[in-house]
Amino acid sequence: MINWTKKDKEFLYEICEKLRDQVPFTFSRFGDGEWLAISQAQPDGINCDGNKYYADLGKRLEEIISKKQDYYIGHQNVNAYTLRKDYLQDWVNSDIFHELSEMQGLDYIFDLLNSVHVVYIGNESLSPLPFVDEFIEIPYNNVWDDYDNVLNEIKNKINDNIHKTFLLSAGMACEVFVHDLWNFNKNNTYIDVGSVFDPYVGKKTRSYHHRLQHVSNIFQL
């Protein structure tokens, strides 16, 4: 059972307000995969999506997390591998959207995203999401191999005349993407949404996806 703290509820309310009002922000999410990449505890391993724990990716992630950032950085509430205590950040709940999906569905989030200009960066299966205005297709895993090209493609979507909300499903590289994009242009919103929308395109890639009761209320293939 999910029990949100007062801080969790306030955080969700705050970012939903910012989405609605098109106030720029960035939301980065550090989970066990990011920490394993940083620690290089499994240098030849891969995460659940087949993404490699690249040493140079781990180095970038550590550089980012070692400095206090001016954007939201999330940490999982679940009991998983973490190095959080070694890094000073104003940690928020990284799974706030995932937990909302499990608790009541994402109807409200879909409505919010339908009201703004969304650029989605993800694998081909996510392109049918109904709120997407522009889509950048990336591989199902290991986008880090083509990081610079993808970053430039995303930057080319930035338009000084319109606020855009960039949603990224790009594995552990997400945290580097949103960091570099935020520091390139702080007039847009950049969110690591992870796998939260997978069930809404018919893909159950996480164990909690099998428990969802509200997916069909929003979108069906």
Please place each PLM-identified region on the residue numbering.
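Short catalytic-loop micro-motif centered on adjacent basic/acidic residues
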Residues: 165-169
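Residues at the C-termini of beta-strands that transition into short coil/loop
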Residues: 77, 136-139, 194
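Electropositive, gly/pro-rich neighborhoods at or near active sites that engage anionic ligands
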Residues: 1-130
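Glycine-rich phosphate-binding loop signature in dinucleotide/nucleotide-binding domains
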Residues: 157-162
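Redox- and metal-dependent alpha/beta enzyme cores, enriched for Fe-S-associated oxidoreductases
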Residues: 112-154
